[in-house]
Amino acid sequence: MAKYVMALDQGTTSSRAIIFDHSGKMIASLNKEFRQIYPKPGWVEHDPMEIWESQIEVAKGVIEKAGIKPEDIAAIGITNQRETTVVWDKNTGKPIYNAIVWQCRRTAPICDDLKNKGFDKKIREKTGLVVDAYFSGTKVKWILDNVEGAREKAERGELLFGNIDTWLIWNLTRGKVHVTDYSNASRTMLFNIHELKWDKEILEELNVPENMLPEVKPSSHVYGYTDKSIFGVEIPIAGDAGDQQAALFGQACFKPGMAKNTYGTGCFMLMNTGEKAVPSKTGLLTTIAWGIDGKVEYALEGSIFITGAAIQWLRDELRIIDNAPQSEEYALKVEDTNGVYVVPAFVGLGAPYWDMYARGVIVGLTRGAKREHIIRATLESIAYQTRDVLEAMQEDSGIKLQALKVDGGASANNFLMQFQADILGVPVDRPQVIETTALGAAYLAGLAVGFWNSREEIEKNWNIDRRFEPAMEEEKREKLYRGWKKAVERAMKWAEE
């Protein structure tokens, strides 16, 4: 009887493989970084072959590290950096161009063109997304329009498109299976999230042939089996979800109104809205959380661009701390920020402002301002931005949040988590396993093969490490937040000509 599930977590900077047991405990983990390619300013690429090779290397390596055999693995679940786009030749299996990464801005002119035509409203309505270079649709168009011979090959049905999940599954099955799941499809800007199919009108507008696109399947489903030549046995590939949706699942946010916030370079907050796609009036994205058991569940998503990256800025550019954990130590040396606010709008502001021209500011400085105050204000900015998104989410959904589940690197910072609870006025729950993205992929795969029987069983695996209760008086909380809103106003539209 197979005792484990393997998650392949293909991220923006590294490929990871993690083995989990039945209780959701991590048995072994291995990761490998790969190259970031910057051909021009604002352009970001990855080599798809390097992604595949690094991913398969850690997959084989982690089995060895765990001291188990491939036949001990019940299923493989995949989670991936979303939106990143690969186009490859169906016959040779080779990419015709590098993968265009989600951060890449090269297709901004295509997006401006769609907006000028007024086509953005249609896209918002059908896909739940805002028109932005972030999503896959314009990236596919760019490859077809700019790589020699690509358009002709596509018309002849010789090319395949996929996000990283699709590319990995295709390679794991040696070209037998070309699929994606609902959550990844919903990030392409080509998928109608209400009708649950590729949208012909958008495909026509972007001139992308439908024959390139993968088949869309549930997020928990046996898509196929790994080719015997890879692990020596055939292992079912049975789970697939984009990284943020996988984290929502790994946090057991199964009921409408449950939300998680992942603290990484930026922050991604997702709230489960159940079987209803809630349109956003406040600048959030409406997205598919997952498709399981013949039905699809939706989520609202708010993306904050700079959170953990602001701590790196204190370390690398300002050089006022030596390492990230030190930020907590310094923040605790002072009682408050002495009236200082930091707005880390280094690349503009994401949800709910969507201001590309905002820039970073430090306000409220007086002669008494010390480095501890600036460090503390930078940490606090992460919590304020999270409140901005949460308020938008509550307004859109009409649901009042009971508690916020957290994960990701900065969720280990106790000062930040306590301040987060204080400024939101709701408890913040940190789980024992903060690797919730990989865990979510493992759960989706395990459910499809009966390794876990139900979501109830998974919920029992979710264990709290610590609950942070709000301890700040309402009056103080609102006064601090008013100051933040004032600081954000100073940052807005700064870089506009």
Curated annotation (Swiss-Prot):
Pathway: Polyol metabolism; glycerol degradation via glycerol kinase pathway; sn-glycerol 3-phosphate from glycerol: step 1/1. Glycerol binds at R82, E83, Y134, D243, Q244. ATP binds at T12, T13, S14, T265, G308, Q312, G409. It catalyses: glycerol + ATP = sn-glycerol 3-phosphate + ADP + H(+). It comes from the Bacteria. Pfam families: FGGY_C, FGGY_N. Keywords: ATP-binding, Glycerol metabolism, Kinase, Nucleotide-binding, Transferase. Activated by phosphorylation and inhibited by fructose 1,6-bisphosphate (FBP). CDD domains: FGGY_EcGK_like (cd07786). One of its GO terms (molecular function) is glycerol kinase activity. One of its GO terms (biological process) is glycerol-3-phosphate metabolic process. ADP binds at T12, R16, T265, G308, G409, N413. Sn-glycerol 3-phosphate binds at T12, R82, E83, Y134, D243. Belongs to the FGGY kinase family. Homotetramer and homodimer (in equilibrium). NCBIfam families: glycerol_kin, PRK00047.1. This is Glycerol kinase. The lineage of its organism: Bacteria, Bacillati, Bacillota, Clostridia, Thermoanaerobacterales.
